[in-house]
């Protein structure tokens, strides 16, 4: 089992089908759910499901994670790109090693898997997931 950082394969087709709207203010609600290192997440992940083994748990963490703030997609140099504002899990006690971004408005469809590169442990502290800056080479989500 592993957490493999990737854009989910199903998401690539769903974008072309118009199933995801990332527009600031009027788009779908996307959430960030945290997972422990033993979770099995990767390109074949198609949806968020509360029954999927490996979701983090702990004080002040709710299954399903937290809502993200969309940043409207842009395009430059042949690449479409978009991201989210940084996400803060407040005053949590938990351990995690990765996350799943998913569309909670539209069937909990998976968008991408994040691997934090290490196991993170927080005890009654904020956990901040910092997204890279918006740009054709840096954004967390890019299609070239």
Where are these predicted regions, by residue range?
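Small cysteine-rich, disulfide-bonded extracellular modules of the LU/uPAR three-finger superfamily
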Residues: 1-97, 104-144
């Amino acid at each position: 089992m592993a957490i493999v950082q990737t854009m989910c394969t199903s998401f690539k087709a769903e974008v072309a089908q118009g199933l995801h709207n990332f527009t600031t203010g009027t788009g779908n609600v996307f959430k960030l759910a945290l997972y422990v290192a033993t979770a099995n997440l990767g390109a074949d992940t198609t949806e968020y499901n509360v029954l999927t083994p490996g979701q983090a748990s702990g004080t002040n963490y709710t299954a399903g994670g937290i809502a993200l703030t969309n940043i409207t997609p842009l395009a430059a140099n042949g690449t479409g790109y978009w991201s989210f504002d940084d996400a803060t899990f407040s005053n949590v006690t938990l351990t995690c090693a990765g996350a799943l971004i998913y569309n909670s408005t539209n069937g909990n469809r998976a968008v991408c898997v994040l691997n934090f590169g290490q196991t993170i442990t927080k005890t009654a502290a904020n956990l901040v997931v910092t997204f890279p800056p918006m740009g054709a080479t840096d954004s967390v989500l890019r299609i070239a």
